[in-house]
Amino acid sequence: MRFKGLDLNLLVALDALMTERNLTAAARSINLSQPAMSAAVGRLRVYFEDELFTMNGRELVLTPRAKGLVSAVREALLHIQLSIISWEPFDPFQSDRRFRIILSDFLTLVFMEKVVKRRAREAPGVSFEFLPLADDYDELLRRGEVDFIILPDVFMPTGHPRAKLFEERLVCVGCGRNQELSQPLTFDRYMSMGHVAAKFGNSRRPSIEEWYLLEHGFKRRIEVVVQGFSMILPVLSNTNRIATVPLRLAQHFAEVLPLRIMDLPLPLPPFTEAVQWPALQNSDPASLWMRGILLQEASRLALPSAEH
């Protein structure tokens, strides 16, 4: 099929080449022979009047013209796939769909475990790929490279549909033997104690508690920075440091670690964990099914009370 002189099949080849950055891998990903893929490269170069790729060993290096085409080609193919080609009926029990989800380790531990267990009963062939919080999740959503992101709603990009999952609140945690926590925590002591904080992604994006504190004009004395929530609580062991974490995460670790959980001595509001998906997948039957599972499991969560 041609559109204004361009064989649309070549866009599939171009997308594979720009994704894989390797001729052999790109050919394999779309079930073409290597000679056929080489021929496609030649035709693409003629059409776009640009080399598009140069070789660096076995790696294909994109020219500036090719870099400018990456998003446009991916979005065009995604739109054709999701909006023009008819949806196939989705049978969870028969499906082998893999869902790619960006979320924090906190959510993996306290929420997705329940979703995974339910999947085993209702959709044994369905699988998940949980991805760490990235710096470019907005772009990944736009290109349809992930199925969902699950984040505090204050961090979510615009332009894609979303739904509320559950509310969470922040608490202070420390080692159970931390004598500084043997009495109610005052604001002055909270601010003066050494803190452990989490950052995410290559740009060291702050976690929700850091964002809230900065929004309210509070700056803690951070002694240790770790990648992800799950590394915070083990680092508190046998120290006088404290951390500010989601309550459900604190209670999850309190089952196996000697932790003390305390209310924060400052007025930070609860926050909302939400799920967001690509706009072009809004009517995808598989995405609709998965959204239903997420919302149903979230509705079963009650906001627990902090233990003192």
From Swiss-Prot:
**Keyword Repressor on entry:** yes
InterPro entries reported for this sequence? LysR-type_TF, LysR_subst-bd, NodD_PBP2, Tscrpt_reg_HTH_LysR, WH-like_DNA-bd_sf, WH_DNA-bd_sf
Gene3D superfamilies (UniProt xref): Periplasmic binding protein-like II, Winged helix-like DNA-binding domain superfamily/Winged helix DNA-binding domain
Q: Name one Pfam family in it.
A: HTH_1
**MF-aspect GO terms:** DNA binding; DNA-binding transcription factor activity
CDD domains given for it? PBP2_NodD
Task: Give every HTH lysR-type domain span.
Answer: 6-63
Highest taxon of the lineage: Bacteria
The entry's DNA-binding region feature spans 23-42
Q: Which UniProt keywords apply?
A: Activator, DNA-binding, Nodulation, Repressor, Transcription, Transcription regulation
| Function comment | NodD regulates the expression of the nodABCFE genes which encode other nodulation proteins. NodD is also a negative regulator of its own expression. Binds flavonoids as inducers.
Q: Which family does it belong to?
A: Belongs to the LysR transcriptional regulatory family.
Q: What is this protein called?
A: Nodulation protein D 1
